[in-house]
Each structure stands twice: as structure tokens, then as C-alpha cells.
Regions:
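A structural motif
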Residues: 106-107, 173, 205
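Conserved strand-turn element in the central/C-terminal portion of the radical SAM core barrel
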Residues: 143-145, 152-154, 167-189, 210-215
Length: 295
């Protein structure tokens, strides 16, 4: 049985307009995917026992009340701090039921995951898209399933994510790939970037949004560097990161200029969007700016 943690609120107003979101929603706390680079592990977020997934108490009741009180609807984003399709979601169904509430109250949604389980809820995505903007994103950082298993050990491998996204895109949902982080010295090759963009095109994804580097904050930095030493003992990646990145918050690939050039050329070739403004305009097209909530 999943552990629970108390919660007073779940849907919060966002600032900055990340992917055009008006609200943010995290039903679960923590994540068990084991991704070695996860920024949510950082000390600044204050999540204790990060690798243990816990559900927020009375999550659906809180979400129902908060949606009902909103004067205007908008896009509710989820997946920023904890993957909404962790293994517990298969039986708990909290994300699915939350999406049903989002649909019932006339809101749009932006869902991010690394789990192929996301395809299960395609029917609800389609219902939401009938009245509001609906966006589905999946994080993919490498085309190599073997490398994926090393750096993202407890979640669907890249090929499974591509398959899931293809099914969702086939149903008419606006989909895309979050190409981030791209780990310097490990994933920052032209072959990897080209492979992801071309696969995005093949599966019907509309955009790829990249970040050619990785964030290294307190707590997460130490975890990441330790894992590099464990997984790739012969590569000396830890030493290379320490020498190249120093104590910087963001470690950008030394190949960033070349990668951006290759990336934009490939996106242009296949009509893949990559600019945030263009992506938001495209997936919200035809819905209007805001909608009144009559519930």
C-alpha cells in the first residue's frame, strides 16, 4: 500500500508561463524512477526520502474543491516534480481520476512523464482536447535503450516511450519530446540528437524541446557524481565533470553550439517545433485564451 502525506492544496497558480500552464498539480511526492540526474532531488525542494513515492492525502477531494472554486479555467500542468505515472499509479489511478476531474470542470492539461503507462489515459486526453488545450510530453534523453537503463533504471526505456507517444499522437493529441537533460560527455553527440529528432518525426510528435546540459544543485550534484562513478568507473566522468563544470549550477555541454546547429537543421527539415512560444501557440490554437468555468 502506498504511503500518504498530508496536503492542504494541490493545484497552484503558476508564474512564468512554462508551456502555457496556468496551474501546476503534483498528486504524488517523490519518485522511484531512479534517474541519476533528477533536479527534483535538489536540496532546495526539501523532499525527504525522495526515492519513496507517497500520495497526497485526500488528493482527489482537494483537486475537486480547487477546480470548482476557480473562476476561470486554464491549463493544469503535471509532472514537474514527481512523475504522475509512477508504478503505484497503475493501481491507485489518482492521475487518471484527477484528469477526469480536469475534464469535467472544463480545464485543459499538460502532462509530462517518462512512463509508457501514460498511453493508458489517451481516452481522457481526447475528451479534454474536445474543449480545451491538451498537451502530452515525454522526456527522452537518449536513443540508446542500454544507456537509458543505466541512467534511468526504473522506468520505461526510450523505445517504449516512443511507442507510447506514437499511440497518443495517432489519436490526434498534440505531443512532443522533452530532450533534457542532455548529459555532457555522455549524451551530447550529434548522432543522439539527430536520432531523437528523426524518431520524433516518425512517431508524429509535433515538437522537441531541448536543454544541452544538466543542472547540478546541492544534494543532487553529489548524488549525480557518485552515480557516475558507480555506473561508469572506467570513464572518469566524475573527474571530467568536476574539472569542466566546477561549482556551477548549470553544466552546459562543451558541444552546445554545434548541437544547436544540428538540432535546428534537423527540426527544420522535418517541421518539428522547438521554440516555446511556437509550441504554446500551436497546441492552444483554436481554443481561445481563457474560458469561464461554470461549475
Amino acid at each position: 500500500m502506498i504511503e500518504t502525506v498530508p496536503a492542504k492544496t494541490i493545484i497552484t497558480k503558476t508564474k512564468g508561463g512554462w508551456f502555457g500552464n496556468d496551474y501546476n498539480m503534483n498528486i504524488y511526492r517523490g519518485c522511484c524512477h531512479g534517474c541519476i540526474y533528477c533536479d527534483s532531488r535538489s536540496e532546495c525542494y526539501g523532499i525527504d526520502r525522495f526515492d519513496t513515492v507517497r500520495a497526497k492525502e485526500n488528493a482527489l477531494g482537494i483537486i475537486r474543491d480547487e477546480l470548482r472554486r476557480k473562476v476561470r479555467s486554464g491549463v493544469v500542468g503535471t509532472g514537474s516534480m514527481s512523475d504522475p505515472y509512477n508504478p503505484f499509479e497503475k493501481t491507485e489511478l489518482l492521475t487518471r481520476h484527477a484528469l477526469e476531474l480536469i475534464n469535467a470542470y472544463g480545464f485543459g492539461a499538460d502532462v509530462l512523464s517518462k512512463s509508457a503507462l501514460i498511453a493508458r489515459d489517451t481516452d481522457i486526453f481526447r475528451e479534454i482536447a474536445e474543449h480545451s488545450p491538451m498537451l502530452v510530453k515525454m522526456t527522452v534523453t537518449t536513443c540508446d535503450d542500454e544507456l537509458c537503463r543505466l541512467i534511468e533504471p526504473n522506468v520505461s526505456v526510450s523505445s517504449e516511450r516512443f511507442d507510447a507517444l506514437a499511440k497518443i499522437a495517432e489519436s490526434g493529441i498534440f505531443t512532443g519530446i522533452m530532450l533534457m537533460p542532455v548529459l555532457p560527455f555522455i549524451e551530447d553527440t550529434e548522432e543522439n540528437i539527430i536520432g531523437i529528432v528523426r524518431t520524433a518525426h516518425e512517431i508524429g510528435a509535433r515538437f522537441v524541446y531541448p536543454a544541452f546540459g544538466v543542472t547540478l544543485r546541492a544534494n543532487q550534484r553529489e548524488y549525480f557524481l557518485d552515480k557516475l562513478g558507480e555506473i561508469f568507473p572506467e570513464k572518469n566522468y566524475r573527474r571530467r565533470y568536476e574539472e569542466f563544470c566546477g561549482g556551477r549550477y548549470e553544466c552546459v555541454s562543451p558541444n552546445v553550439k554545434r548541437l544547436w546547429k544540428v538540432f535546428t537543421e534537423e527540426c527544420g527539415k522535418y517541421g518539428i517545433l522547438y521554440d516555446m512560444g511556437d509550441i504554446v501557440s500551436a497546441y492552444k490554437s483554436g481554443y481561445g485564451d481563457t474560458q469561464l468555468s461554470f461549475f
